[in-house]
């Protein structure tokens, strides 16, 4: 009995399943939320009822899958709104409220998808109907238009209809759209012509009403001419305005046009501290380096300045310190740059082509009138005459980047004056603040002085040590200063001539000494014996010889006895006398005898230089 009952229950479920499924499909998945509830209730039943429900469920699932092959949503989700067994197991673990919410969301998503499909089908039908209507209107327009088709209208109409039917059948959507646009343009032109005709008629009627209909041909001609001129002026005025707008708003397409708004590094340095720097620079173009190319040269690009910002680091620009950086744009990219990387060279054609391509791609190409305006701004900024207020602002701007003042004395004097004024006003707090600033300036000055003398501190220490050592030796008596009586060739001497005055005997002695060098005799004593006892003449005679006028004009050799000491070498032969000619000079013994001789010897020797001279 149990088997028969189960079989009968299976048959009943099979009969009921198609009816319920058909009614459910008409109502867009109406009973589907009931299915998981039935499964939930079946899960809560006894174990005896479970084996009876499983085969019926499998059969209903297969039937529903076969019926649901037409819809695109049922490919991934089955009738129970589950993708696979894991999804179903996950759903079973949820609470009742979460289960209902999950089922509702899945049903809503399926309904939305079905609604989208229906809307898409309706739109496709409407597009098809509109295309058919467009074809019919074209046929009617061609059939109504006369002219050259009057010869054989039936044949041409039939051939046109056949070709139009074929074109309508094989015509894609873009061709149909072009035809629609063309028809719309023709309709607009016809409407404009009709409006112009109506306006002309209305103007003519108004003139007739004012001046009368029988005013003559002149009035009619003048009215027609006025209407024509007014209509022509109306037609020409917007064209002229548009042409002017086109000329004014012409885009930059040449390198010469872009060069008008170019800024170099030198121009930027001229107005870096000016109060109008930001407004002048924004909108101009600069040439910036982008590193090395594959070859030997550097890579440069053209950038547009879109803003000015301040950075934390201070750098130098043409000898001027600043912390300003420029925000530049090239196509769709923006980057901040220091102005020290801006090139002084002009733009090149390759760089301009790259910049033009990037601007066209991103749609930010400038116009010629903007270039002219920026050129005027640059010239105005460079040739600007600064007022006292602007100069004060520039000085403040420069002082921001100076950590140490240049002129310590001047700054200290200014602070001292302000301190005195504060004390006179009785503002003790301000006077104390100024005093701290003065102390800071003095400290900075001392540090700079130490840095300057740091390189020469070692040499200064050595010099100071040597001076102190010599001073101690002189004071203690260890060091004695000896005066050298002999002439030192390395000491400086006075080169000026001095007038020598003295007795006649001294002058005669000097003359005899000078004449003895010229008159040299052949005889003499032994050279070795004469050189053994050299005597040095007194310093007074040497001074007289040098200062004597006659000795200055003597071209003969002046024997220096001090130097003969060094070159003297005693000979081995005892009594051999050298054979000296009279032209080479006399021996030392003869020279001594003549020096020690009386007035007769002096007079005899003094005759020689007079004859020689």
Curated annotation (Swiss-Prot):
Keyword presence, NAD: no
| Entry GO terms, CC | Cdc73/Paf1 complex; nucleus
Comp. bias (Low complexity): 215-235, 510-521, 602-613
Localisation: Nucleus
Residue spans making up a coiled coil are: 175-209, 425-462
Annotated GO molecular function terms are: DNA binding; RNA polymerase II C-terminal domain phosphoserine binding
Q: Listed disulfide bonds for this chain?
A: none
Give a yes or no for keyword Nucleus in this entry.
Answer: yes
Indicate, by first and last residue, each region the UniProt record lists as having compositional bias (Basic residues): 55-68
Stretches with biased composition (Basic and acidic residues): 167-176, 236-247
Cite the record's Polar residues compositional bias ranges.
569-586
Q: How does it assemble?
A: Component of the PAF1 complex which consists of at least cdc-73, ctr-9, leo-1, pafo-1 and rtfo-1.
Q: Which function does this protein serve?
A: Component of the PAF1 complex which is a multifunctional complex involved in transcription initiation via genetic interactions with TATA-binding proteins, elongation and transcription-coupled histone modification.
Name the UniProt record assigns to this protein: RNA polymerase-associated protein RTF1 homolog
Q: Which organism is it from?
A: Caenorhabditis elegans
